[in-house]
A protein has these predicted regions:
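Conserved catalytic cores of large enzyme domains
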Residues: 1-166
Length: 166
């Protein structure tokens, strides 16, 4: 998301809760449209000059990517996905999903409860605290499998900026 949005910490006016605010970058829609046009032109040229390229189905791949990237540019969709995942794991001790502040969320701005914890990349701190990384990995796999097979709903924004250990 770093290429699409910026993330800032804040405090809501008149509230005591700390939040994280994700804001789409200025002109990001224009940039994405331009990039898609370049991809389509590149795909056309590859198909034009390489007979074997037909099996790659570049037109379809680019079309699917276009649909996916424009969904990522609607932060209300991300907020809804976060809410569904929070509900799906409401009884779990393995995963904490932040609350969405819907009154402060739009297509271009997502406001979430701030989460405390160690960055999942801070191996040294986890080792110093005696966190068993094998159990952590097993729990991660269980969470993934629950999303796929139990919930049939996979919120796939798993990157180090979104995963904290506590």
């Amino acid at each position: 998301a770093a290429s699409l949005a910026q993330v800032h910490k804040a405090k809501l006016k008149g509230a005591s809760e700390n939040v994280v605010i994700k804001v789409l970058r200025p002109n990001i829609h224009k940039q994405v449209h331009r990039n898609i046009r370049v991809m389509k032109a590149g795909g056309f040229l590859v198909n034009l000059f390489y007979k074997e390229s037909g099996r790659l189905k570049l037109k379809e791949v680019i079309h699917d990517y276009e649909k996916t990237i424009f969904k990522e540019l609607d932060l209300k969709i991300e907020a809804a996905n976060t809410t569904v995942t929070k509900k799906n794991f409401s009884d779990s001790d393995l995963l904490f999903i932040p609350k969405v502040f819907w009154d402060h969320t739009t297509v271009n701005v997502l406001t979430l409860e701030e989460i405390d914890g160690l960055a999942c990349t801070d191996i040294q701190a986890m080792d110093e605290l005696g966190i068993d990384r094998k159990i952590l990995a097993e729990n991660g796999v269980k969470i993934f499998l629950d999303q796929v097979f139990r919930d049939n709903f996979f919120h796939a924004d798993m990157h180090p900026g979104n995963i904290f250990v506590s």
